[in-house]
Amino acid sequence: MFFKTLKEAFKVKDVRARILFTIFILFVFRLGAHITVPGVNVQNLTEVSNLPFLNMMNLVSGNAMQNYSLFAMGVSPYITASIIVQLLQMDILPKFVEWSKQGEIGRRKLNQATRYITLVLAMAQSIGITAGFQAMSSLNIVQNPNWQSYLMIGAILTTGSMVVTWMGEQINEKGFGSGVSVIIFAGIVSSIPSAVKSVYDEKFLNVRPSEIPMSWLFVIGLVLSAIIIIYVTTFVQQAERKVPIQYTKLTQGAPTSSYLPLRVNPAGVIPVIFAGSITTAPATILQFLQRSQGSNVGWLSTLQDALSYTTWTGMLFYALLIVLFTFFYSFVQVNPEKMAENLQKQGSYIPSVRPGKGTEKYVSRLLMRLATVGALFLGLISIIPIAAQNVWGLPKIVALGGTSLLILIQVAIQAVKQLEGYLLKRKYAGFMDNPLETK
């Protein structure tokens, strides 16, 4: 189905241009992920670049952090900045609340604020991680460890992060899919070969012949688990609750009734990405403090455990963040107040529900139930592989396997739907003012 849609899409000039533009941007992203930042000893990075709290950053950047490349920070600062801006719109800063109600003009102001916050966070996080790596390693990671070197490396990494953010915006405007999600998708896909190699090395190289059958059983189990996760995730991500609506006034050609689709998981995979980004920066600071203060500082160890996927406390904290962000982002994606207002303006209503405040309360209750299902789903899919890796000592690929598949499937579904939308537009191009060009 996907390949058939892709084949049809390539026949449309505008769609073909968007696909090729997206591929070009992703090529530049992957190129930058292999260019190491000047002033860093890459060969000394192995000791610290595989720390558990950096797994998420390595995942979304396609191992760019492991190489300490130009794009090592990836979109993590932008994601954190987006969370901050969305929180500030919730009656915290009046100016941000005002902008959120100004339509397109307000959206531009909020985007600009997000960029400024991204710049500050990227600089702070870049210098912090560089200094932290230097403190945690027994070898010199920074060739000349002085404040000028830290500032230079921080500036380069910050520039790289801003460039990646700009790439995401360009994909939004001229390419396919949500820019940030597509870049994360590319990072995960690029990590697959190295992940497969690590499983092969661990399970098939330098093992006794008697252990080979168990290795094959592990691989079969891993593949079957991935298939199950793909099937369940695809089903849940596309499932929706259809809320019937009716029209108070009939106009020529208008339907007498319709429905309002609410997704079973309104937040998508954004909560998982948010939770991973939130845990990365504090964990870096704690690692740095613990190495500089000594390993016997109890409160530092406790906090570090709370942010590490390798402990049960850390897993529960990660799951809690996913649940909280699922509820938060569900109400960001589907605003009950605005939805009730729009229905009333359109002269439509939900049967047996009073328009206005009654509709708002009804949608809020329904959204809360759907978000609960979505939170449980995202939490389980993300946590079960991590727990399995911790209990049975499975390869690292397993720990974030659920998260990776969630993101890959969601981005793929969005891309297919967008392609189908363009093809549908082409089908009815004869009824539109600006039909899409072919050939």
Curated annotation (Swiss-Prot):
Pfam families cross-referenced by the UniProt entry: SecY
Keyword entries, A-Z: Cell membrane, Membrane, Protein transport, Translocation, Transmembrane, Transmembrane helix, Transport
Membrane-crossing segments per the record: 19-39, 68-88, 116-136, 151-171, 176-196, 216-236, 269-289, 312-332, 373-393, 396-416
Gene3D superfamilies cross-referenced by the UniProt entry: SecY subunit domain (1.10.3370.10)
Membrane topology: Multi-pass membrane protein
Protein location: Cell membrane
Gene Ontology terms: biological process: intracellular protein transmembrane transport; protein targeting; protein transport by the Sec complex
InterPro entries for this protein: SecY, SecY/SEC61-alpha, SecY_CS, SecY_dom_sf
GO cellular component: plasma membrane
Entry similarity comment: Belongs to the SecY/SEC61-alpha family.
Subunit field text: Component of the Sec protein translocase complex. Heterotrimer consisting of SecY, SecE and SecG subunits. The heterotrimers can form oligomers, although 1 heterotrimer is thought to be able to translocate proteins. Interacts with the ribosome. Interacts with SecDF, and other proteins may be involved. Interacts with SecA.
Function field: The central subunit of the protein translocation channel SecYEG. Consists of two halves formed by TMs 1-5 and 6-10. These two domains form a lateral gate at the front which open onto the bilayer between TMs 2 and 7, and are clamped together by SecE at the back. The channel is closed by both a pore ring composed of hydrophobic SecY resides and a short helix (helix 2A) on the extracellular side of the membrane which forms a plug. The plug probably moves laterally to allow the channel to open. The ring and the pore may move independently.
HAMAP family: SecY (MF_01465)
Name of the protein this chain belongs to: Protein translocase subunit SecY
Organism annotation: Lactococcus lactis subsp. lactis (strain IL1403)
